[in-house]
């Protein structure tokens, strides 16, 4: 089962907009306006298999700017497989995956990450001997624009003040909640 929950009650952010319905209202005509209509992430008629076992049958998902999507289901119901497809770690047998209206199926995982798609797994997988700063910068390893990386790091530290307070600490010394914040910030880098 897939549940979509719109963000409400959160301050506006460049990452998720302000969550108001007018963010998704039909825009005026024109190329830029038409581009605002399509979902940010789309899976269309995705079919995937593990050997003879079909993991997805015509899976359709749409995620618009300002939405949080939660994949819910029992063991072996395809949640992790869906994320692997979105991240480019697994190619579906058929169907489309679009990010910002462009297919990601021909892209490598680093190219998909550069487009701004990230994931925070249940297991945070930080590098415990590295500092928080070094862990965050690992989220931008595939990017060459140092100024943009520095700007993103600054934004993450503003978004997660507790992470900013711990920027020079080794990640392994942080509490579980602090480590989760670092993992989320790294995914947004």
Language-model-detected regions and their locations in the chain:
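Helix-to-loop junction immediately C-terminal to a conserved catalytic motif
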Residues: 87
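Conserved ABC transporter NBD signature motif
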Residues: 95-103, 115, 148-153
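Short beta-strand immediately N-terminal to the Walker A/P-loop
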Residues: 69-70, 119
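ABC-type ATPase nucleotide-binding domains, specifically the catalytic core motifs of the NBD
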Residues: 51, 69, 107, 132-151, ...
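The feature captures the beta-strand-to-loop junction immediately N-terminal to the Walker
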Residues: 72-74
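Conserved ABC ATPase signature
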Residues: 170-174, 178
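ABC ATPase C-loop
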Residues: 187-188
């Amino acid at each position: 089962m897939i549940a979509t929950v719109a963000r409400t009650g959160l301050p506006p952010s460049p990452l998720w907009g302000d969550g108001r319905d007018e963010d998704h209202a039909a825009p005026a005509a024109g190329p830029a306006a038409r581009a605002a209509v399509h979902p940010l992430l789309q899976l269309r008629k995705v079919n995937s298999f593990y050997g003879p076992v079909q993991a997805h049958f015509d899976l359709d998902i749409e995620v618009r700017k300002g939405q949080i999507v939660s994949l819910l289901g029992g063991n072996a119901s395809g949640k992790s497989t869906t994320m692997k497809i979105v991240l480019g770690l697994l190619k579906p047998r058929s169907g489309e995956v679009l990010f910002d209206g462009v297919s990601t199926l021909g892209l490598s995982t680093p190219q998909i990450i550069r487009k701004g798609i990230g994931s925070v797994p249940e297991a945070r997988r930080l590098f415990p001997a590295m500092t928080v700063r070094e862990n965050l910068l690992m989220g931008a390893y595939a990017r060459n624009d140092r100024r943009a990386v520095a700007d993103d790091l600054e934004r993450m530290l503003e978004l997660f003040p507790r992470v900013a307070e711990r920027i020079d600490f080794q990640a392994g010394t942080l509490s579980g909640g602090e480590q989760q914040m670092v993992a989320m910030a790294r995914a947004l880098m």
